[in-house]
Each structure stands twice: as C-alpha cells, then as structure tokens.
C-alpha cells in the first residue's frame, strides 16, 4: 500500500517524516471512556453469587479477616512452635481457673474469652475490661423481657414506698457533681433531703428553720441554672460563677432580672416537657413578686429544674464546651462502648477486684515472657523486662494470700507502684479510683451501688447524719475509693454480723435514702405495655433511716438463703449488696459517734417562707421584666437588720464556732418584742408604699430614701 507522507508532521530535530494513516486503514480498537452506560455495557454484565465476606453484619476488618482466614489457616498452624502451644495451654487453664470473676452474662470482664486459638501477642489482655468501672448494659435484663412477671415473685421488702420524683432528684444531684466547678459551695453539699424539703415535696417532721434554708438553696440553684443558661460566649470559659453564693443571692434586689422573661419567650421554641403540654402557660406565675420557684406547685418545681438541666446541656455555651471536651478526650474507657457505667468496687465487691488484679498480673507476666523470648537487641529493654517480671512475681505472691484483708492491702500498695513499671501498657487497673480520670466523668452513675438481675437497680444518693444542733453532710465521703476500702478492712476484721446502726442514740438521726428502681418492669413497660409510662411507679424507697436499713439487710439475707444455686447472677448481686450495706452501716455508726462526742452550740429557728409570706430584708422587685440582675455593691440597697443577720448566719456561726455573741443578742431581742414586731416583719415593699411611689425607678435616690424612712417608722 502506498504511504502518504505529510510534510507538516516532519520532526524538526530528527528530520524524519511521520506516516499518517488514512481513515479506512485498520488500527487498534478504541477504548471507551468512562461515562454513561449503554445497552452494550449491560450485555457484558454477569450475574454472580454474593460472596460470604461481604455480609451486612460484618465490618471491613472482619471481611478482610474472613477472606484471608482460609488461605492462612494451614500456614498458621504449620508455623506454630511447641513453646507457643504451651503458652496457649497455660492461658486456657488460667481462664478456667478465674472464670468466676464475671459479674453478668454479657460483661466484658470475662476471662473465659481466652480460647485455645489465642496467639502469642496476648490479644485478650487488651480486649478485657481492666478499668475501675463496669458498663451498665441493656442486655443485663434483655433475657427477662419475655416474662410478664419480670421481677422476682418473692420480692417484697418490708419498706417499699413509691417515690416517683426520685429519678429527677438524682439527676439534679448528679448534674451538680459532674459540673461542680461552676456552682458555689452552698450547692456542692446538697443532699437528697435538701432537694426534697426545699421543693416542698416532703416537709413533714422538719423544723421551720430547716425548711427555709432548703428553700433558699433551691431558689439559688434555679437562679444559678438560669444565669448559666444565658451565659454569653465571652464568659463561657470564665469560672467566676462560683462567686454567686447564697449570701450574695439573698442580698440582691432582683436576682432573676429579665432572665425569667427571656426563658418564657424561648420555652416554646425549645419545647415543653410532656407534663406541661396541656398547659403552655405554666410559667406565667414564675417569679411572681420575686418568689422564684416557690410560686409554682411542688411537682412543677422539680419538673422545671429537670428541664433547666436539659436546656443547659443543649443551649448553654458553657456546658456545651465542657461536654465537647469530655467527649473527645484521648484514652480508652476499657469497654469501648459509650454507655453509662458504675464503679466496680460497689457493683461487684472487693473479691472481684482482687481476682481481676491477679488475672491481670498473670497475663501480663506471660506477655513479658514472650517478649523476652524474642531476645531484644537493646540491653535497656531487656533490663526493663527483667525488672517488670521481678515486680510481677512479688505481686502474684502477695495476692495469693488466703486472707482477704491481706490481699486487699497488697493490692492497694501494688497499685501505687504499678504506674512506674507499666506506664505505657495500661492506663487503668481494677483497683484505681473510678472518680479520678475525667474520661469516666460524663457517663458515670455516681449513686448506683448494685444491679441485681430479675430485681432491679439500687442507688444511694447523698444524705446527712446529725441532730438539730449539729449535722454532718456525708454527701460523697463514703463513695470515695479509699474510704470504702478502709471500712471494708474493718468489716472483715470485726465480723460479718455487725449491724451497729440499731444501737445508735435516738436523738442522732441518719436521714438516708436507699432508692430501688424496678428496671426490668421499666424496660418492659417501655417496649410492650400500652399503659401510660408515668402512671406506673418504678422508683421506690426501701430504707429511710438506720432501723429501716437494718431491716432491709435482714430481708436480703433471708432472700439470699432461698436461692440454692450459688452461681446464679441474682444471688451474686444480692450478696454484693448485703456486703456493701453492712460496710455502710459501720460507716454510719462511727459518724454518729463522732457527732455525739463533738461539742454543739445553740441555734435559733427561722420563720417558714412560703409564696404568700416573704422576708422584708431581701428586696425582690415586683417587676418581672425589670433590669438584669444587679450585682454591683454600690447599686444594690442592702438593708439587713441585726435580727435577720443573726437569724440567717446562725448555722454558719455554729459550724465555725463564731458569732455566738451575735446569736445571743438576737435571741434577747426576740424575747423583748412580742407579736407586734413579728407582724410588721411580714410586710412587703409593695404594701408599704403607695402607687405614686411604686412608679418611681428602683435605683432612684428618692425612692431609696423613702424606703429607709418607711422602715424606720415600722
């Protein structure tokens, strides 16, 4: 064929003509570019079966493992040496030896997961839960959901009073604990009874002074949450909110300001709770004449505080930034699931902690032996491995003691030295304090002490011990790890049948709240029952003082003896709860003895403050939509009489042993003046001044002088 030479295509450097082919000349088939599919493309499609490795319930890593499992199975077993086989047998025997350390059927802390196919890298050592907390899973009660009678049929404690607001009260107390750096010291020692009395949910049997103090604290809590909710972005990182104390709150003329009106305008946008959806004007009377929470019904008060916590978590810049920080911490919780969790020593007992520590040391020593067999070239690494193995050898010898108290002392001592040898191996051990690391802070159930399958959950919120003259708030002292371990040693040394709380003096009261939640019935009603969830009680009080606590312990002992199977999870949960409550009884007895031996001072009662009777010395504004809360000392007119000063500060002076002369002085004044002066105290500013005077500005000099002259006339 004749070739056609195109002179325009000649290369300038080589001077060699290039051949240009004609259109009808044969060439290579053109490859189609990627684009829209045509019918020709569909003709080439072949139908194949779905591969096993691409199942919907497996992740990418699981699919890759399944694909390579068959190809590497023969190579894996052929390359296994005799020494590694011995290691596998030792780990399997160890798993059967310590198989009793699991608490629930679905707990991640199961040593039985060590199988015969464990490789030499000791993967189960990192997958098991060695943290001081254990997760609270739904699967703990899942197998009981098919039963109509979820709870044990013989579960009938001597005291089981329905307490529908218990969950909301513990939510408030838990929120204060998690974000205690923004609240004042007056709110950090709140107990369950303080919230219950301050919101008038239960006021029977309490003095007028105690009721009024609790009411002031609840108004302080509401005002603090209101200020934090509308905190600006500039002040989001400022920790000056702790300066908003109870004394400062009571001295302000209008502590709420425009914040209540702003809350009313946004509540429709944020959404109402289900209890208020039939009455959208529930907040119309809030802060009427400066009354705060006391202008609402008792049940509406607890609902409002619960909603304030939810709104702060969602819309407050201060709490939003803190939650963002706590949820993005570097570290591992140990169980790799974002769920609620509770402390191990309360839920499982000391024996579980000691067994877990022993298993951890055994597996860690085996891992170090495998490292040593690889003969590291660096002499520094070899010496480090030898020192670690020597330390673990002494640890295992100490934990092999038969006496539980000796094992516990050894475990505490070992935990102090653990970080020096294994700083990069594990971040947590079972004997650690569960409240130290911030990674557990956000989802910790602080007051939970037991979970019993087929029965439910048990909580011990903050309480106080004392009498009218002196009281000690034991809010969080017993839940401390070191405190619990010290009393556990005393309990083991003194005997297991000690119930000293019954022999305590009658004048020293222990007003605790042991709360029981029927969790199995709660889950079942949420899933299968058509009955309205709020109409069925799920929260109960099973102990309210020392005597009822002793009766409940005796009932649990009789209930535990009915179960013949010692391996049952229900029996294990009951035994752990009995042990915890007996140790708690020793703590109560020693605290009461310490209060009885301490000298007490005389204090005076205070008048009850209700929605219709408010003190004159705190100048609440009648204008709800007034100026924003005034906190400057030169702008606020603080006119506090000597009677009120001694009356309010009597509790603080008793605790600090100061101001006794002031208390005696006020007591003498009240003896001289009879009912005439007491009636005048109950008058408000609105009743004192006429309408033209009330129309003046609150900050005007003329109105302040008229106010002072009017009180002098009274």
Curated annotation (Swiss-Prot):
Compositionally skewed regions (Acidic residues) per UniProt: 628-650
Feature: compositional bias, Basic and acidic residues: 654-674
GO terms for biological process, alphabetical: heterochromatin formation; sister chromatid cohesion
Keyword Ubl conjugation found: no
GO cellular component, one term: cytoplasm
Biased composition (Basic residues): 704-714
UniProt subcellular location: Cytoplasm; Nucleus
The entry's keywords: Cytoplasm, Nucleus, Repressor, Transcription, Transcription regulation
Domain of life of the native organism: Eukaryota
Annotated Polar residues bias: 610-624
Disordered as annotated region, ranges: 598-674, 694-714
Subunit structure: Interacts with GAL11 and SIR2.
Job of this protein: Involved in HMR and telomere silencing via the recruitment or stabilizing of the SIR (silent information regulators) complex.
Note: Present with 432 molecules/cell in log phase SD medium.
The name this protein goes by in its record: Protein ESC8
Organism whose genome encodes this protein: Saccharomyces cerevisiae (strain ATCC 204508 / S288c) (Baker's yeast)
């Amino acid at each position: 064929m004749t070739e056609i030479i195109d002179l325009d295509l000649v290369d300038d450097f080589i001077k060699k003509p290039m051949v240009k082919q004609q259109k009808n000349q044969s060439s290579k088939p053109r490859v189609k570019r990627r684009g829209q599919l045509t019918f020709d493309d569909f003709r080439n499609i072949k139908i194949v079966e779905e591969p096993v490795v691409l199942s919907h319930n497996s992740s990418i890593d699981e699919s890759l493992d399944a694909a390579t499992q068959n190809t590497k199975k023969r190579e894996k077993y052929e390359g296994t040496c005799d020494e590694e086989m011995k290691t596998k047998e030792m780990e399997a025997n160890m798993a059967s030896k310590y198989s009793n350390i699991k608490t629930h059927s679905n707990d991640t802390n199961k040593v039985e997961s060590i199988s015969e196919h464990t490789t030499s890298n000791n993967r189960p050592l990192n997958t098991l839960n060695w943290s001081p907390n254990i997760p609270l899973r739904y699967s703990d009660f899942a197998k009981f959901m098919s039963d109509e009678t979820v709870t044990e049929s013989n579960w009938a404690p001597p005291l089981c009073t329905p307490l529908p607001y218990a969950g909301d009260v513990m939510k408030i107390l838990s929120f204060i604990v998690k974000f205690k750096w923004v609240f004042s010291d007056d709110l950090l020692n709140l107990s369950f009874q303080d919230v219950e009395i301050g919101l008038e949910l239960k006021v029977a049997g309490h003095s007028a002074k105690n009721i009024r103090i609790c009411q002031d604290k609840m108004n302080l809590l509401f005002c603090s949450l209101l200020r934090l909710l509308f905190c600006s972005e500039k002040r989001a990182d400022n920790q000056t909110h702790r300066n908003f104390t109870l004394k400062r709150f009571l001295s302000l003329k209008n502590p709420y300001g425009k914040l209540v009106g702003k809350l009313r305008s946004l509540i429709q946008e944020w959404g109402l709770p289900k209890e208020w959806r039939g009455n959208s004007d529930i907040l119309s009377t809030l802060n009427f004449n400066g009354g705060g929470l006391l202008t609402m019904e008792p049940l509406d008060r607890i609902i409002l505080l619960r909603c304030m916590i939810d709104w702060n978590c969602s819309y407050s810049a201060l709490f939003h930034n803190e939650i963002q920080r706590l949820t993005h911490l570097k570290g591992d919780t140990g169980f790799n699931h974002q769920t609620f969790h509770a402390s191990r020593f309360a839920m499982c007992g000391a024996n579980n902690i000691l067994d877990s520590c022993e298993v951890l040391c055994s597996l860690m020593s085996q891992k170090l032996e495998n490292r040593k067999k690889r003969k590291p070239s660096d002499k520094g690494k070899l010496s480090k491995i030898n020192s670690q193995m020597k330390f673990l050898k002494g640890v295992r010898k100490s934990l092999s003691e038969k006496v539980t108290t000796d094992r516990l002392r050894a475990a505490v001592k070992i935990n102090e030295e653990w970080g020096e040898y294994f700083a990069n191996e594990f971040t947590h051990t079972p004997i650690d304090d569960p409240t130290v690391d911030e990674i557990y802070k956000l989802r910790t159930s602080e007051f939970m002490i037991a979970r019993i399958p087929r029965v439910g959950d048990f909580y011990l919120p903050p309480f106080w011990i004392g009498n009218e003259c002196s009281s000690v708030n034991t809010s969080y002292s017993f839940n401390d790890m070191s405190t619990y371990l010290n009393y556990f040693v005393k309990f083991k040394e003194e005997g297991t049948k000690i119930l000293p709380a019954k022999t305590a003096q009658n004048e020293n009261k222990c007003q605790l709240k042991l709360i029981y939640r029927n969790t199995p019935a709660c889950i079942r009603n949420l899933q299968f029952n058509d009955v309205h969830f709020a109409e069925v009680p799920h929260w109960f009080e099973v102990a309210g003082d020392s005597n009822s606590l002793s009766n409940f312990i005796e009932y649990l002992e009789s209930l535990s003896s009915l179960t013949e199977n010692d391996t049952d999870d229900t029996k294990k949960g009951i035994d752990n709860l009995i042990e915890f409550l007996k140790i708690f009884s020793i703590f109560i007895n020693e605290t009461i003895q310490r209060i009885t031996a301490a000298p007490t001072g005389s204090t005076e009662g205070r008048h009850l403050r209700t929605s219709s009777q408010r003190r004159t010395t705190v100048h609440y504004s009648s204008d709800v939509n007034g100026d924003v809360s005034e906190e400057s000392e030169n702008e606020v007119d603080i006119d506090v009489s000597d009677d009120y000063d001694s009356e309010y500060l009597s509790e603080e002076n008793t605790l600090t042993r100061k101001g006794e002369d002031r208390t005696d002085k006020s007591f003498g004044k009240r003896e001289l003046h009879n009912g005439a002066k007491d009636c005048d105290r109950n008058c408000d500013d609105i009743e004192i001044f006429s309408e033209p005077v009330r129309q003046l500005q609150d900050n005007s000099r003329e109105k302040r002088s008229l106010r002072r002259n009017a009180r002098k006339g009274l």
